[in-house]
Amino acid sequence: MSQNLDQQVTLTVTLPDGTTKPLPAGSTGMDIALEIGRRLAREAVAIKIDGKAVDLSAPLTADCTAEIITFDSPEGKEIFWHSASHIMAHAIEELFPGSKFGAGPAIEQGFYYDIASEHRFTEEDLRAIEERMLLIAGRDIPIVREEMPRIQAIEYFRTVREDPYKVEILTDTLKETETVSLYHEGGFTDLCSGPHLFSTAALKAVKLFNISASYWRGDQSRESMQRIYGIAFPTEKLLKAHLSALEEAKKRDHRKLGTELELFMLSPEIGSGLPVWLPKGAIIRQELESFLKEEQRRRGYLPVYTPHIGNIDLYKRSGHYPYYSDSQFPPLTYHDEEGKAEQYLLKPMNCPHHHLIYSSKMRSYRDLPVRLAEFGTVYRHEQSGELNGLVRARGFTQDDSHIYCRPDQLVDEICNAIDLTRYVFATLGFTEVETRLSMHDPLNPSKYGGTADVWEQAEKDVREAADRMKINYFIGVGEASFYGPKIDFIVRDALGRKWQLGTVQVDYVMPERFDLSYVGSDGQKHRPIVIHRAPFGSMERFIGVLIEHTAGNFPLWLAPVQAVVLPIAEDVHDYGSEVRDAMHRAGIRVELDVRNEKIGRKIREAELAKIPFMVIVGQKEKEGGSVSLRRHRIGDEGAFSIQEMTEKLLNEIAAKGLTTKPTTNA
């Protein structure tokens, strides 16, 4: 045996299951994957070494823990899609020489790249770029990381790549960085921190969706660019499944169903981002509000109402102005009889109004907690390109509550708010819920109010409550509000998409700004702590998500029309009216269809209208004082007396259960 081999250093690699693998120093993540199995090596996207994601080609230098990252994980998808954006840029550079590249990140579903090019991209170009991406993938080009001094990288991108955008990033964003990383992919090179795929060969299927206008660094005063969106997968099967899910999502689009089911309308004459509830949609909203109001009453909340506008000084005091000035409507200026000017804002938040309600009288420690609740409408000047039906609007109603409590009550009150939010989601059929503890970014203190000590205590309280409620949570650094940390609830709908809905927030800042107090057992004034809480988040957004989650097949208690009576022939119209009236008196939302149409057509149209129950009556039912009951999407449920049928529906309404579990079928 040679002297070199005798002296070769062996490293110990510990896998997630606790087993260890001895490997020579300099082995790579791909070597580890191959040691475990060739199939895993084929599926590997990157590897975590001591908890940090790195390239599969990175050499090992010490004993470590290792975990292979595959496409199945969120982190794996992000790495795969980020690499796909590089492959797309590579393809564009080959097809359209002279193109320059801005930002090209992975996003929640795929990736995009901003391109500066004299060529105006078309749909036909997208198909050509897809083909070239697959051709590049077929070349099995290694994706190689190179670390380089920043000064040298500036010269490289200035003279070799001739890319002014990367030069700007290197001289501006990364000016404090000594060493940067580049990724080479054959003749294409990009500036990136990585990690990336081992080779282009991992990409097996790609779809580019659309082209939109963008600006360099999102600044409208800078260069105009073209943004191309796409998604890629390691198998053709996964792409087909994704495209199928997109088609299903189109069928479930709340804007489409909202029109078809006559739930709400959007009118340019009223204004962009200002949805109007039609009678059927208003019923859904009223039912949800009544449900939460009753649950809040049971849990000790007190209802309040506040105006739609407020003096601008109120929002300056709270800090909402200027923190949210970019997303607020311009102030309204009012001059009184003496010419004195006062400025008002369309209410961007309910919080300041509630704080003044709390401070309108002296509070004792025995009075706390005080739980104020309101369905309060607020207004945000969202950019027109960000508006999306109900889920992103300029005027929306929050199920807002503010809880004022003593320090010894805080964790209990946070837990109660978490419990209420969970109850709401479970009742509405959202069974997959992720929880994010949104913390402040200590490197960006100017973004937040309050002191470092206050933030440390608030975040400690949030963690304690989450742990007590046995929540599986993840940390979101920089996701906190300016006044405190949050517990954000992210639901997964029937198509697997994620939506952030409810929130619970702890606030030590506003009590100081509004000089809130209570008299303690020692006779001295003390500061309460505020909890901001909204299980729905906003009524508009929640209902928009609920429409898509259920595909408009609402549970019986929420359905705008809970049943329709369908007479088979004209000679039983009178009996149909009798059945309808009995159901109406019982409190069931019911309609009567007396059109001169065949019963089969009436049933089909009731199914299309997604009415939960069809009550069919013919001569036999009239003579027997009965009805034939049919359930939407399921079919015949049998014969019942009018009273039995009414009781059956009322029991199901009272139970507030989903009539059927949400499915992927509309």
Curated annotation (Swiss-Prot):
Disulfide bonds: none annotated. Pfam families: HGTP_anticodon, TGS, tRNA-synt_2b, tRNA_SAD. GO terms for cellular component: cytoplasm. GO terms for molecular function: ATP binding; metal ion binding; threonine-tRNA ligase activity; tRNA binding. It catalyses: tRNA(Thr) + L-threonine + ATP = L-threonyl-tRNA(Thr) + AMP + diphosphate + H(+). Homodimer. This is Threonine--tRNA ligase. It comes from Chlorobium phaeovibrioides (strain DSM 265 / 1930).
